[in-house]
Amino acid sequence: MLARFPLYLRLVRMDKPIGSLLLLWPTLNALWIASDGHPRWPLLAIFVLGTLLMRSAGCAMNDYADRDFDRHVKRTADRPLTSGKIRAWEAVAIAVVLAFISFLLIQPLNTLTKELSVVALFVAGSYPFMKRFFAIPQAYLGIAFGFGIPMAFAAVQDTVPMLAWVMLIANIFWSVAYDTEYAMVDRDDDIKIGIRTSALTFGRFDVAAVMLCYAATLGIYVWIGVTLGFGLAYWAGWAAAVGCALYHYTLIKDRERMPCFAAFRHNNWLGGVLFAGIAAHYLLAGTAGN
């Protein structure tokens, strides 16, 4: 069992934290906004750990669902499940255990948060199969990756206001943007095996679609900033996020594999500076209030 532990870590992508960060930033945005910049530390710990666990569970389920496809894709052919180093039942068991631990984590929280967690579990578990039927599965991924937003508001306020759903919509656009960049890396392989992705659906308009999704995401965050009366610190973070999006254009415009993958990974910075702007606004507002 211990000898297989490194394989299990690879299965759940512990060696590749970018996916966890892409889930974490919008969740932190929601926690900070819902609590006016003062989230309780136990609640913060629950959401951070829960995000890491559910992302890991999602990776295990994704590899299980795609095990017959991944062996035909250059980037994924050597994954533990695809290469036969672990069995399919092990991946499912790991996903179930991680999801169960995540559910235990939220037991101290209110009923609404627990109810939303059931929806989140269904969306996360069903996402890997959307690539067979849905032309833009990245939009469904945005719901799965962003469901921590309504859950955060529910945990803090015991309600889910319209603002939370607007933030979720922003996350859907952002997910389509960065996961289309990711799909552009595997475009040739996906054509051969018949997987549906946004990169194939958008076709020659893929770069334009990515940039429009960035524009929609950041446009929604303009509305959020204006509606909540955010100050200069927030807008500095927002401007830095715009700069990240423009930098991504320089990476993806020629549709080359490695630059597209670099653009995908760089979205960690886009999410990070946007959160930094939100956190800095509340920090400075609290300091000014004192």
From Swiss-Prot:
GO BP, sorted A to Z: ubiquinone biosynthetic process
Cofactor dependency: Mg(2+)
Catalytic activity: all-trans-octaprenyl diphosphate + 4-hydroxybenzoate = 4-hydroxy-3-(all-trans-octaprenyl)benzoate + diphosphate
Main location per the UniProt record: membrane
This protein's record includes keyword Magnesium: yes
Entry GO CC: plasma membrane
Transmembrane domains' residue ranges: 41-61, 89-109, 133-153, 158-178, 202-224, 269-289
Annotated keywords: Cell inner membrane, Cell membrane, Magnesium, Membrane, Transferase, Transmembrane, Transmembrane helix, Ubiquinone biosynthesis
UniProt-listed Enzyme Commission number(s): 2.5.1.39
GO molecular function: 4-hydroxybenzoate polyprenyltransferase activity
Subcellular location: Cell inner membrane
Highest taxon, organism lineage: Bacteria
Membrane found in the keyword field: yes
Pathway: Cofactor biosynthesis; ubiquinone biosynthesis
Protein family (similarity comment): Belongs to the UbiA prenyltransferase family.
Protein name per its UniProtKB record: 4-hydroxybenzoate octaprenyltransferase
Protein species of origin: Burkholderia ambifaria (strain ATCC BAA-244 / DSM 16087 / CCUG 44356 / LMG 19182 / AMMD) (Burkholderia cepacia (strain AMMD))
Gene: ubiA
